[in-house]
A protein has these predicted regions:
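Secondary-structure capping and boundary motifs in well-ordered enzyme cores
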Residues: 25-30, 68, 79-80, 109-120, ...
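A glycine-rich phosphate-binding loop feature that marks nucleotide/adenosyl-phosphate handling sites
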Residues: 57-59, 108, 143-148, 181-182, ...
Length: 374
């Protein structure tokens, strides 16, 4: 670890920046080395130890340890292509309690993406931005009319950064994410409580409506700022939609309420997390795993898995096959081909048989003349 950072070599120059590590993350099966031998090596070198050792468990598949020999390994590249890396990262970190094993399930993953990301976060952003565009042409007026009902949402938002900090310091990432989504759920509830669609019908309630929508935009800003370390690709898209300039998206501002300009301008964008067809996706993902497991089973038994859709013959059919030997009389390369050889072979019939085969990479024509083949 420290050599790669530049310790006692001139190739790298990051040792002073990154060592000692604030958190050293390791898997539970290598804890003994990192908790005993590695610290002893550092002490012998008179170097500081990592400040905290975080040990994570294994991710199992439906309760079973993932194994290449079994074929039940979930391919993260396949999942990333289908649902996006942010969604997969969120699901794993939300499901996994550090220090314990976590069971991965395609069904639980897809349902969580739909419920947390598409329904809760995605709909909150979409509804809020859509209402600002519908009632104010995309730009909120500066007039405000606060009400008592606003205070619970505002106080919940203001308390969020401290709560997430506490969980992150304990490397309880799942609990930090749970706290952030409590605020997102509270913001969705606030929409139902304040009924902005009713306020929008009354011209005298425009200032009140602007206040409600501004509070929602601020709740989105704070929660997505804290989510950005978990979902770094998607959150900038949210900030663009809610009119949050990059300079406003800071850790310090995540502890404040009222950072967005009063006359903020929003810009509706595509759905952040489109809903997934659960049944269709589960069938396709299970089919992939099933295919992997069949191939692994065949490999373990020394057999090659038969291509899907191609029937295999039985021993009775094989017994009907007539095998003949033939002596190669002539052999020459096929013109304009790098692989093919044309062979004239005597199999005991009236005249030689012509055979074309792709073996020129392995045999020279003159090496085959006189050979007997089946």
């Amino acid at each position: 670890y420290i050599t790669a950072l530049g310790y006692k070599n001139d190739k790298y120059n990051d040792f002073d920046k990154f060592w000692p590590a604030d958190v050293h993350m390791v898997a539970k099966d290598i804890m003994r080395f990192h908790a005993i031998i590695w610290p002893a090596m550092l002490m012998a070198l008179d170097l500081p130890l990592p400040k905290h050792l975080a040990v994570h468990g294994w991710i199992t598949f439906n309760g079973q340890k993932m194994s290449k020999s079994i074929g039940n390994v979930v391919d993260p590249f396949v999942l990333g292509e289908r649902y996006g890396c942010d969604a997969i990262r969120y699901h794993i970190l939300r499901e996994m309690a550090l220090g314990a094993d976590s069971s991965f399930s395609n069904e639980i993953m897809i349902n969580r993406i739909n419920s947390d990301l598409a329904n809760d976060l995605g709909n909150l952003v979409s509804r809020t931005v859509a209402m600002v565009e519908k009632y104010f042409g995309g730009t909120l007026p500066a007039d405000r009319e606060p009400a008592e009902i606003d205070n619970e949402l505002i106080n919940t938002v203001l308390a969020l950064r401290k709560k997430t900090d506490e969980y992150l310091d304990l490397t309880q990432l799942n609990n930090a994410l749970a706290e952030i989504f409590k605020v997102i759920s509270r913001a969705n509830k606030y929409i139902d409580e304040t009924t902005p669609w009713v306020l929008g019908k009354d011209e005298s309630k425009k200032a009140r409506l602007a206040t409600v929508l501004y509070n929602l935009l601020e709740a989105i800003r704070v929660s997505t700022t804290l989510l950005s370390c978990f979902m770094p690709t998607t959150m900038p898209k949210v900030w663009e939609q809610i009119g949050a300039d990059e300079s406003l998206i800071t850790y310090e501002n995540a502890g404040k309420f009222g950072v967005l300009p009063a006359a903020v301008t929003v810009k509706k964008g595509p759905a952040l997390f489109p809903r997934i067809d659960v049944e269709k996706e589960i069938d396709e993902l299970n089919e992939l795993i099933s295919k992997q497991m069949k191939e692994a089973e065949a490999k373990a038994s020394g057999k090659k898995a038969a291509p899907e859709g191609i029937a295999q013959i039985g021993i009775d059919d094989f017994a009907k096959v007539e095998l003949r030997t033939a002596k190669i009389l002539e052999c020459e390369p096929v013109k304009k081909s790098k692989k093919l050889l044309k062979i004239q072979a005597d199999d005991g019939t009236d005249k030689p048989r012509q055979i074309v085969c792709g073996i020129s990479e392995y045999y020279k024509p003159d090496e085959l003349i006189g050979k007997t083949v089946i």
